[in-house]
């Protein structure tokens, strides 16, 4: 990408590992002053390379003990209003990721739920309220163990 060099790549890689790293620590890793690192980070943000910062959270503290990956086979993967239809789902606190993808199931949704009943309730709403006639079928996988999330190794 134009305007991005090896030092920028290292900065991004380090921020992905630990977005709370200090500018001074980051500067030591790349051989720059904290001020120079700050300028580079601001440039990366303006270019859209860095889109935001987030925390990896243990959702069990919020009573959500079950993580599920829901794949949806769409009737029409190129439906022009798909992004608009997905807006309520994208705003749900417990839905962390939504992807349009290739393959047999063109939509993937990752979310956390209190229990199987709350997951089933979401699946019912997903089919009947949010996706109505857009979903042909769904496939659900329950996450048994999480080893890495948002670039952070958990175990």
From Swiss-Prot:
Which cysteines share a disulfide bond? none
**UniProt cross-references to Pfam families, sorted A to Z:** AsnC_trans_reg (PF01037), HTH_AsnC-type (PF13404)
Gene Ontology BP annotations: response to amino acid
A GO CC annotation recorded here is: cytosol
Which intervals hold domain HTH asnC-type?
4-65
Alphabetical UniProt keywords: DNA-binding, Transcription, Transcription regulation
Q: Known PANTHER family for this protein?
A: LEUCINE-RESPONSIVE REGULATORY PROTEIN, TRANSCRIPTIONAL REGULATOR, ASNC FAMILY
Report the protein name in the record: Uncharacterized HTH-type transcriptional regulator PYRAB00550
Task: List, in alphabetical order, the Gene Ontology terms for molecular function in this entry.
Answer: sequence-specific DNA binding
Q: Which residues bind DNA?
A: 23-42
Which species does this protein come from?
Answer: Pyrococcus abyssi (strain GE5 / Orsay)
SMART domains reported for this sequence: HTH_ASNC (SM00344)
């Amino acid at each position: 990408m134009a305007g991005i060099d090896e030092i920028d790549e290292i900065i991004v890689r380090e921020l992905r590992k630990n977005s709370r790293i200090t500018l001074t620590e980051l500067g030591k890793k790349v051989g720059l002053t904290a001020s120079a690192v700050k300028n580079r980070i601001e440039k990366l943000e303006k270019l859209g390379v860095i889109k935001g910062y987030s925390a990896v959270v243990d959702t069990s503290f919020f009573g959500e003990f079950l993580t599920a990956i829901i794949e949806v086979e769409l009737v029409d993967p190129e439906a022009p209003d798909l992004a608009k239809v997905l807006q309520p789902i994208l705003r749900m606190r417990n839905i962390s990721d939504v992807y349009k993808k290739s393959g047999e199931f063109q939509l993937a949704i990752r979310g956390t739920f209190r229990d199987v009943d709350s997951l089933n309730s979401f699946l019912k709403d997903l089919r009947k309220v949010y996706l109505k006639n857009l979903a042909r079928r769904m496939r659900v996988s329950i996450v048994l163990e999480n080893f890495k999330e948002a670039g952070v190794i958990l175990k």
